Amino acid sequence: VEVRIIFDDFGNLTRLHDETLQQIQNAGIEVEVFNPVHRYVNRIYFNYRDHRKIAVIDGYYAYTGGINIADEYANLIVRFGHWKDTAILLRGEAVQSFTLMFLQMWNLTEKEPRWDEALLPSPPVEAEGYVMPYCDCPLDDYKVGESVYMDILNRAKDYVHIMTPYLILDNEMETALKFAAQRGVDVKLILPGIPDKKAAYALAKSHYQYLTAAGV
């Protein structure tokens, strides 16, 4: 079985030891490090991080969500109390979109990009509704993720419920959240009570007063 892993270097600087990485590679697993941290790297590029969590299996199944590969996610260690996270399982043609997302990142450093052999056909499944996975990256000129959220907030008629570990808003996004609540949409946000990033937690709290005053 071909097993490939991409991980972001910044998030593993102090937690992934060279010996562990070597054991993974010795087991026949291919590994790519996204945007390795180097003191000579331009600070703008240093901020280009890959925060996506994607697992694709044989073209049949795709998992995505907030779950990393780390001991606290398996409750082997306790860092911030009981660790709760969410992921979803997808089947059908949407799986190919996740395969392409993975290959796009993998092939950034490949001299001979591999596409076709990994794009296995995804058997169709019967389902109500429509699933359209999307992604964005620092190389894009268009902010896909932000645009999707803005469209959801501007079109919503009944409710918008969002669960996120980090609430980092620009003025446009904060205004969209407040405006949706003010026109009668039930807007609810769920955030961690115990932060893993204190700076991000403080930044999120700076928005609370303005959001709650608008009815969020």
Annotated model-derived regions:
Residues 1-216:
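Charged, low-complexity intrinsically disordered terminal segments
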